[in-house]
Amino acid sequence: MRINPTTSSPGVPALEKKNLGRIAQIIGPVLDVAFPPGKMPNIYNALVVKGRDTVGQQINVTCEVQQLLGNNRVRAVAMSATDGLMRGMEVIDTGAPLSVPVGGATLGRIFNVLGEPIDNLGPVDTRTTSPIHRSAPAFIQLDTKLSIFETGIKVVDLLAPYRRGGKIGLFGGAGVGKTVLIMELINNIAKAHGGVSVFGGVGERTREGNDLYMEMKESGVINEQNIAESKVALVYGQMNEPPGARMRVGLTALTMAEYFRDVNEQDVLLFIDNIFRFVQAGSEVSALLGRMPSAVGYQPTLSTEMGSLQERITSTKEGSITSIQAVYVPADDLTDPAPATTFAHLDATTVLSRGLAAKGIYPAVDPLDSTSTMLQPRIVGEEHYETAQRVRQTLQRYKELQDIIAILGLDELSEEDRLTVARARKIERFLSQPFFVAEVFTGSPGKYVGLAETIRGFKLILSGELDGLPEQAFYLVGNIDEATAKAMNLEMENKLKK
């Protein structure tokens, strides 16, 4: 891995006025810069504009070269607002791509696309920085072994298991528990795998980013007393920022994650919220650069841009980056080029259901809609595969019977169907689980359930051994032993009431 040790501020290497240009034209967030003959910067080089605007305010804008126009001119996209820039202003070619701080110093902090801290907690140690543009790991470096990434969350591990070094799409609207699920995964990877997480907020609402940060501090994922003990680094490029920043913020987060994987040899969890906004920003930049749009107005380079980001998210022999990406589907059209291109890269999908959230079943992961390429007997083993399939069949049958139950009631069902409904309701409740990060809100201690325990619990429910237990005993418990203990407590309480 190429690490550039510098003592400069993040974002750009140490500035020496070797190669100077002048602004020739400004079109919104796009600048045309003229350089002396033979001194043209390379594509993706960072350019810095420093100076003062008309009212004497200090200006410091970083841009990235996107096109060489000919006649000693380049076209660059700004990473921050271009207000106050004027034609003729001096532009410094840094001679290298954007570089951002990496390593332990980034944990517990919030950064912008340039790797500058934006949380008012002082400067960050920038002795180790890394360029945001890198090629994907070579074939020989990849770890081709298929292994399950255990999350400790029953519904995920059993029905839609994550691949170590894989990519997972997280589908869900507002208020169904996406943030809590993300925080629990960050917490569990730190405890069970000794890993760290990087969160890339790509084109999201500033309010949501702030809420996530506050909730992480409240739940202990970010340790305010000892910031180095934190388990996550946050990188934000919000909705109000120029398209250049939103297009590159995902790469900034990925670069930080790659350092933990390649140098620290850790398992890393990379969250991208929202991957659609990455495509959207690329589409805006493409239009600003004057490229001919492709289908539905998207950029012609859509697949290439997506591929260059996604191919860097992988397992190597040193460690792994497992990525969880929130996917917004425009107008619920799964054939839209943006989500359709994303699906090609995903190993698993976790779909959050508003119906389950309304029932109070958390995590509200839909067991029938969520899928995984890992759920094959040769990967997970016969026992896991058989249990998952039987759980799905039971829940599917319950779904089919719900209309009959609503019209005619349970009594009109056959004995076999009544048994299926009873077991399905127990399974549905047993798929819920108390989270560590929700302890501060719910008061019930969080539970991490190993895969073997999860399979054992569902096998016992399916076998009929627990048919005599009340269904509320299975609600918000960890393993199956806790459910039987809860059933005994409920029985004792009922006897005392009588």
Curated annotation (Swiss-Prot):
Organism: Morus indica
Keywords of the record: ATP synthesis, ATP-binding, CF(1), Chloroplast, Hydrogen ion transport, Ion transport, Membrane, Nucleotide-binding, Plastid, Thylakoid, Translocase, Transport
Residue stretches in coiled coil: none
Keyword Nucleotide-binding: yes
Protein name, entry field: ATP synthase subunit beta, chloroplastic
Highest rank taxon of the organism: Eukaryota
Gene that this polypeptide is encoded by: atpB
Enzyme Commission number(s) from the entry: 7.1.2.2
Cited PROSITE patterns: ATPASE_ALPHA_BETA (PS00152)
Record GO biological process: proton motive force-driven mitochondrial ATP synthesis
Keyword Thylakoid: yes
Binding positions for ATP per the UniProt entry: G172, G173, A174, G175, V176, G177, K178, T179
Membrane protein topology class: Peripheral membrane protein
Oligomer and partners: F-type ATPases have 2 components, CF(1) - the catalytic core - and CF(0) - the membrane proton channel. CF(1) has five subunits: alpha(3), beta(3), gamma(1), delta(1), epsilon(1). CF(0) has four main subunits: a(1), b(1), b'(1) and c(9-12).
Catalytic activity field: ATP + H2O + 4 H(+)(in) = ADP + phosphate + 5 H(+)(out)
Signal peptide positions on this chain: none
Pfam families registered for this protein in UniProt: ATP-synt_ab, ATP-synt_ab_N, ATP-synt_VA_C
InterPro entries linked to this entry: AAA+_ATPase, ATP-synt_VA_C, ATP_synth_F1_bsu, ATPase_a/bsu_AS, ATPase_alpha/beta_chains, ATPase_F1/V1/A1_a/bsu_N, ATPase_F1/V1/A1_a/bsu_N_sf, ATPase_F1/V1/A1_a/bsu_nucl-bd
Family statement drawn from the similarity comment of this UniProt entry: Belongs to the ATPase alpha/beta chains family.
Compartment(s) of residence: Plastid, Chloroplast thylakoid membrane
A GO term, aspect molecular function: ATP hydrolysis activity
